[in-house]
Amino acid sequence: MAPNIRKSHPLLKMINNSLIDLPTPSNISAWWNFGSLLGICLTTQILTGLLLATHYTADTTLAFSSVAHTCRDVQYGWLIRNLHANGASFFFICIYLHIGRGFYYGSYLYKETWNTGVILLLTLMATAFVGYVLPWGQMSFWGATVITNLFSAIPYIGQTLVEWAWGGFSVDNPTLTRFFALHFLLPFMIAGLTLIHLTFLHESGSNNPLGIISNCDKIPFHPYFSLKDILGFLLMLLPLTALALFSPNLLGDPENFTPANPLVTPPHIKPEWYFLFAYAILRSIPNKLGGVLALAASVLILFLCPLLHKSKQRTMTFRPLSQLLFWTLTANLLILTWVGSQPVEHPFIIIGQLASLTYFSILLILFPLTGALENKLLNY
């Protein structure tokens, strides 16, 4: 019998073992679709970004005009830009749901996969931040100024570090140039990290909603999950194109239609919606260094998840108390997101402080305690 090239060719064999003949748990739900959706997001962002980069000029005098030129004069330039800007939002929606799934179903117990995933999230956040600066509107400029300035809170080396990052004494042309270079480079770094993430995942195999070993009941990835993933792509690309075509500026800030002006500060400086929860935590602490540490901790706390797991069961499927806590945390994050978009005044200050406190309390104290309590309840 002739050898099957799909199973004998060195390169095709790798693809086959990752996407075609991969043994997959038969009971994984739609929550397991977000990994492939993130892959589609990354591909879309790299393609649209590449096309935008061919028409973009990384210079303070020309950046804003070059983006306007892309939208007005380039064939379908407006569409490419709208897909790229809103594609970032969908990227974050998918990654947050993907992390939520991992947290709910105890996927963080695959430590290497989880840790590379958190590194991927941090890289994505960095990419989105430097990308937001490129159109060189008011919010681009002031967002870059405020967020990079946070590094000056680091004792002893802070100020030097910030001036080194800026390439001068304020956000200016050198900053824009290096941010463009970083924004071009980082997505390819994300692609590389994704391969590492997948390599670690395929070492252990996928988790499943029951959190039990599924070796006795596996099915091939293709055609079952390849088809399921295609349905997922369609269900994501539909709202993305709808948003890009009908209300492309819905999630943006009107302030960014004004070219950057270092002499005029916008009344409310705020990041894109997907950073608002972290921004609210940053603002809730009246001390600069304390705020920066809390901001960093709000994301880095994910690294602690495997260490804080105290339950005998892996998933929350049969743990009603942990489920209640999980959805409280979800509501808490939505409150933080809302507070982050509001001005710094009463009652938003106190709401933000309480929400920040509960965020850390739930993750660091209540989840491990509830896990231990549920173990006790199992014995009754």
UniProtKB/Swiss-Prot annotation:
SUPFAM superfamilies referenced in this protein's UniProt entry, alphabetically: a domain/subunit of cytochrome bc1 complex (Ubiquinol-cytochrome c reductase), Transmembrane di-heme cytochromes
Top-rank taxon, per record: Eukaryota
Residues binding a ubiquinone, per UniProt: 202
Alphabetical keyword list: Electron transport, Heme, Iron, Membrane, Metal-binding, Mitochondrion, Mitochondrion inner membrane, Respiratory chain, Transmembrane, Transmembrane helix, Transport, Ubiquinone
GO biological process per UniProt: mitochondrial electron transport, ubiquinol to cytochrome c
Entry's cofactor comment: Binds 2 heme b groups non-covalently.
Primary location recorded for the protein, binned into one broad class: mitochondrion
Cofactors that this protein relies on: heme b
Summary of the function given for this chain in its UniProt record: Component of the ubiquinol-cytochrome c reductase complex (complex III or cytochrome b-c1 complex) that is part of the mitochondrial respiratory chain. The b-c1 complex mediates electron transfer from ubiquinol to cytochrome c. Contributes to the generation of a proton gradient across the mitochondrial membrane that is then used for ATP synthesis.
Miscellaneous comment: Heme 1 (or BL or b562) is low-potential and absorbs at about 562 nm, and heme 2 (or BH or b566) is high-potential and absorbs at about 566 nm.
Assembly, per entry: The cytochrome bc1 complex contains 11 subunits: 3 respiratory subunits (MT-CYB, CYC1 and UQCRFS1), 2 core proteins (UQCRC1 and UQCRC2) and 6 low-molecular weight proteins (UQCRH/QCR6, UQCRB/QCR7, UQCRQ/QCR8, UQCR10/QCR9, UQCR11/QCR10 and a cleavage product of UQCRFS1). This cytochrome bc1 complex then forms a dimer.
Name of this protein: Cytochrome b
Gene expressing this chain: MT-CYB
